[in-house]
C-alpha cells in the first residue's frame, strides 16, 4: 500500500473518481433511507466539486454558506471498498470487498481523546466500534497548536489533497460519515475539521464507524513521501478523519485552511444541540444488521471447521485400524500381482490366503486370544476411548437431533436407571458386543456380494467366449454347392407318350397333366425363395434352394488369400446361376455336388475345458446339460456325492439340501430340520442296542400273529398290515445291524412265497379252492425249510411304494387261533426240588477230552501206520488199479485169503491237501495179513469205515489189542516225529523182506493176490502231515 501512495499523489487530475466506504448514516437521515442504503457513496471529481448519491437533506440542518440544490439520483449499491480509476469510473458491482476489524485497544491507546473518555471506551469495548465526538472535542483538536501536516492515510492509502484551480465557493471539501456532516479538507490538515465551508458543519454528534481493519497496517502506511517529516505530531488528531472520505490539500495551503476552520467554529456553535439530533433507532438497526452478518459468517466458518475436524478424525481412525490389522495379519501374501486378472481369481486367492493364515498357529492363536480375552492392553483401550469420543463429538456437530437423552423419556425413570446401574462393570469381550455382531454381519454381506459380483462377471465373460467360439465355428463352415439339375427322365417319357396320342383333345390333356406338376413346383420354389429373401437380412442369395442369411456376414469374416478370393468369386457366379429357378427345379439330393468343404465335427463332450481349474460335479438337483463344455461334467452323476467331512459346514449342508448354497447362504438360512436330522441320525447310529434273543417258543407264537391280524375287514387289515410291516421293518433294521445273522440273511431271496402271494394277490383274483391249495403248498416247504430258523414276519421288508399301491386281500387259509396274554405265576415256573437235584451235564474241557480220547487214539494209530509202510515198486504185475482203489484179485486156489478193505477215497482228502506228492493208499499192514477175518468182522469194518470218514483204518476185529490212551500233551511237541518215523521204518523194512521171501516161493496166481504197498511219502511231506494232524482239534 505504501508503494502505491506516490502514484496516487502525483497529479491531481489523474484521480477522476474515488469511491470510499462510509460509515452508517447519522440521525439526520430517515429510517427508511437508512435501511435501504446504509452506506452512501461520495464521488469527488477532479475539479473539486462534490456529487452526493443520497437523498436530499433538510435545509434547516444544512450549515453551508452557499447551499445548492442537488438532483436526486438512484440509490447506489452497497460498496464494501473503494476503487481508484485513472480514466473512467468503475461500476459498483465490480468493487472489491475489503473487510477488516479494528483493534479496540489500539484505537483507544493511540488517540489521547478517546483514551481519556471512560464512557466511550466502555461503549467501544462492549458494542460495535462507533466513535462519537462533539464540537468541543473538534475545537480542542483544532487549537492544539500543531502545524498543518499532511493527513493520515484513509483505508490504508495516503491521498494527496487536490487543489482547486478556481478557488471558488465550492472549494475542496469532503463529507464525513456518509456526507451528512461535511468537513473541509483544509481543516483536517491541521488536525481540525473545517474549511471554506465551515458553516456547513452540522451541530451535534458526529458518527464515525471505524472499518474492520487493523490499525497496525494503517500505521505502516501513514503518509506519503511528501509528509514523512511531521507524521508523529498529528497522529493523535488524524483518527476522526480515517473513516470519512476527504480530500487532502497540499502542505502549502495549511495555514489558510487552519484560519478558515477557526472562523467557522466561532460562527456556528453546535454544543446546544449535541444529543438532540441522534437517531437511536437507526443506529440500533444498523448495529443489529451488522451483528447478524457476523453471526452468519461465524456459523459458516464453524461448519467448515467441523468438516475439517471430521475428516481428520476419519483419517486418523483409518490409519490406526489399518495399522492394527496389518500388524495382526502381517502374514498374508501380497495380492497386488493378481489385480490385473479376473475378480474371481482375486477372490479365490484372497480366500485361500485368509484360510491359510487362519490355520497357522501363531496368527490364529494371537487373533483368537485377543478377541476372546477378557482384558485388553491399555493402549488399545485408550485409543478406543479417544476414537469413540472424537466420533461422538463429530456426530453431534453434524447431527443436531443427537441428544444425550431420549425425548420421550422421563427424568425420574432415567435417574433410577442410572442409580441402579453398576459403575464398576466388568469388561465385556469384543465378540459379545453388539458392535462386533453388526460388523460381522456387515462383513458377511459384503464378502458374499463381492463373491457374487466376481462370479457374475466371470459368467458373462464365459458367455461371450462361448458366443465367439460359436461364431467362429459357423464362420469356418464351408458351403456345399450343387450343380444344375438335369431334365427329369420321367417327364421325357411322359412327353413321348403324349405324342403318340391320336386325338388333339387327348394330347392337350396329357400335356397339361404332365407339365402342370413341374410348373407348379417351379412356381412354389420361386415363391418360397422370394419369401425367404424378403425375411432375411440384407440381400442374401439362395443356396441349394434355401436362403442362408449368414452368408454375406460370414464371407467378410473368413480371412483368406488369393485362392480364397477366387473361390468366393466362383461361388458368387454359381449362386447367381442357381438362383434363377425355373420349372425344372428338383430336390437337392438329385443334383450333383460341385464343391464340399470338409466340416469339422465338434462334439461338446470331447472339448477340453476352457479353464484349467478342476471341475466339480454339480451339487444341485436341477437339470443340467450333461454335454456343456463350460460345466466340465461329462455326465451327470446320478449317485449321491460323497460327503467330504473336511469341507466347511455350509458345503456339506448344500449336499443334503439343494436350497442351501455353499457360499451365499447365511447360517440363518439353514433349516432347523437339517440340524435336528443330524442330531437324530447320530443318536440312532451311535447308541448301542442290547439285542434280546427270544426263545424258540416265543418266536413260534409271534409267527402265528400275522394270520390273526387278517381276521378283521379288508380296509382295517390293509392299514394294520402296512403299518406293522413298516414299523417292524424299521425296528428290525436297527436291532439286527450288529448281529451276525444280518450278514447271512442278506444272501437269502428277498421275497418269501408268502410275500409273493401278497404282491400277486392284487393282480390276479383266484378262487377259494385254488387259494387254499396255494397256501397249503407254500406252507409245507416253509415248515421243512425252517428247521433251525423259524419264520419271522420281522424279516419281511416291503418298500413304501409297494405297500401304498398294493391292495391287501384276506388270505384263503384256515385261521389259527392264538391265545391272548395271560397272567403267569412266576413261582410256578421255578423247578421242583427234585429237578434241582438232577445231575447237570459237565461241559468242562476235561470232560470233552475224555470223551474224545478214543477217536484221538484211532487217529494216531492211522497216521503212524501210514508212515510205517515200506516203499514198493510201482507197475508190479501182482497189483493193478481199478476204480481208483488198489484191490488184490481173489484167487480161486485159496478162497480163504484175506481181502483187505481199501480205504475210502474221501478219507484221503485230508492227507492230499497237505502232502506235496501223490496221496498214498492205505491197505492193511503186512503183519496182519495172516489174521483171518470172518464176514461179521468184515461187515463191522466196512460199517466203521463208512460211518467215520476221518478214520479209514478198520478195526482189528477179534484180535484187537487194547491201546493205552495218550497222555496230555503240550504243544509244540517235545519229541521229533521225524526221528520216530525213521525208527519205525527200520523195523517195518525187516518184516517186509521176510514177507517177500515167503511170497516168492508161491505160484504166480497166488503172488498176484498179494497186496502192493503204496509208495512211501517223502520224509518232508510226512513231517508236514504229522504236524498238521497234531494241530487239528481233538473233537469234531
Curated annotation (Swiss-Prot):
Post-translational modification Phosphoserine, affected residues: 249, 268, 922, 925, 976
Region (Disordered): 145-211, 226-257, 399-423, 739-787, 869-931, 989-1020
Biased composition (Low complexity): 245-256, 759-772, 906-919
Sequence segments annotated as region (Required for activation of KAT8 histone acetyltransferase activity): 781-813
Annotated SMART domains: PEHE
UniProt keyword terms in alphabetical order: Acetylation, Centromere, Chromatin regulator, Chromosome, Coiled coil, Cytoplasm, Cytoskeleton, Isopeptide bond, Kinetochore, Microtubule, Mitochondrion, Nucleus, Phosphoprotein, Ubl conjugation
Quaternary state and interactors: Component of the NSL complex at least composed of MOF/KAT8, KANSL1, KANSL2, KANSL3, MCRS1, PHF20, OGT1/OGT, WDR5 and HCFC1. Interacts (via PEHE domain) with KAT8 (via HAT domain); the interaction is direct. Component of some MLL1/MLL complex, at least composed of the core components KMT2A/MLL1, ASH2L, HCFC1, WDR5 and RBBP5, as well as the facultative components BACC1, CHD8, E2F6, HSP70, INO80C, KANSL1, LAS1L, MAX, MCRS1, MGA, KAT8/MOF, PELP1, PHF20, PRP31, RING2, RUVB1/TIP49A, RUVB2/TIP49B, SENP3, TAF1, TAF4, TAF6, TAF7, TAF9 and TEX10.
This protein's name: KAT8 regulatory NSL complex subunit 1
Protein's organism: Mus musculus (Mouse)
